Amino acid sequence: MGPQGTGGLAVAEGIDVAPWAMGGTGVHSFDELQPLEWPTRLEAGTLNGHGIAGLSTGLDFIEAQGGVEAIAAHERSLAERFLAGVREIPGIALYGAFDQPVRSAIVSLNVADIVSAEISDALMQGWGIATRPGAHCAPLMHRALGTERQGVVRFSFGYFNTDEEVDTAIDALCDLAC
């Protein structure tokens, strides 16, 4: 829930992590090597102040919503609602182990033998629904699933999605598949 490129590093005491980049630190600006003390040892160049502020705001937001588990529960609820609706649509192929509780809010599917990019485009053009079609950087998975030609359409439900949006997606898929 923060800007891309922000994060943290937890290192156990006694572990030596060598700097991967060298550059000014603002503390020892004329030294060619990184300082030995932490955290400046790993902070070459200018710190990403905007990213750090954004990450802090993201963490505050997570806390205000009741924590990561509360957010994940909402997202899983949306995915389960979506699955319950699309399972009833003829021609929808779902990919995943759905005999267990939904572990993430990502659902991958296909509509008949239509190429995933065509489905994704139709969802965006007709209903304003953004999905991710294709191979998702997982060619071996697609070989195992037999979806190399078609790819899959990936729905990713997030905290700001609503039940109404899920219902719209189900209706849209019904229109496309029926």
Report the location of each language-model feature.
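Pyridoxal 5′-phosphate
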Residues: 1-178
